[in-house]
Amino acid sequence: TYASAQHIVRNSYYSAYGMTTDFTGVLGAQYIYHFDKCLFMPADLTGGIEFNHDNLHDKATDVQKYRDAALAEDPTATGDRLQQLIEKYTPAPLNQVVNIASVYAQNEWKNEQWSFLIGGRVDKNSIMDKAVFSPRANIRYNPTQDVNIRFSYAEGFRAPQAFDEDLHISNVGGELVSIVRAEGLKEERSRSFNASVDWYHYFGDFQANLLVE
């Protein structure tokens, strides 16, 4: 089992970053079991569960910057008109709470010449309607002690959520940008294929390596 937590409070750098608080916590458990023989060769079975919590709040605080922008649009603005323009240029506060529950498992068969890995992970993000399944597979073959041939496939995803690092990049450059997560966004998906041949060889005290990928 494992657990970690982090709480960030940011209110610095000449008000460019506004006021940001971000609490993240992780709680999980992992189990590993070794088979002397599973079907056709030794294997390691790994399984686990994990829960991630992220609570992000962000509020712009540089009122003078937004007042200057308002007066640049209408130098004669006063009273309610000026306040309306200031509100127009002030980025909307961001309040985002994300909970992610995950379960994963993989089994790796291996000996000195071969290894076969197959596994998968299911993640349920609270800002998404459905859980996402991400599979992975890997095959390794060593025809000789110096040569390693590997083929792998993996899938991944990224949920449509805002991150602390994205909030104030434009503001630091002088642009007034409000980050808002649009409704109905779907997750980004990735599929990765990889094939490689890795060669190692010792020449006395020196080691040579050639990788084709």
Task: Name these PLM-found stretches.
Residues 40-46, 115-117, 138, 142, ...:
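Membrane-spanning beta-strand positions in outer-membrane beta-barrel proteins
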Residues 21-23, 41, 97-99, 131, ...:
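Residue-level preference for beta-strand/loop junctions
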Residues 126, 146-193:
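Surface-exposed extracellular loop regions of Gram-negative outer-membrane beta-barrel proteins
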Residues 61-63, 132-133, 164-167:
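Short, glycine/charged-enriched secondary-structure capping and boundary segments
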Residues 1-129, 211-213:
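Face-selective signature of the C-terminal outer-membrane beta-barrel domain
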Residues 1-11, 142, 150, 184-213:
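Membrane-embedded beta-barrel scaffold of Gram-negative outer-membrane proteins
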Residues 33-39, 109-113, 133, 141-145, ...:
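Outer-membrane beta-barrel strand-turn architecture
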Residues 28-32, 102-108, 136-138, 152, ...:
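Outer-membrane beta-barrel architecture
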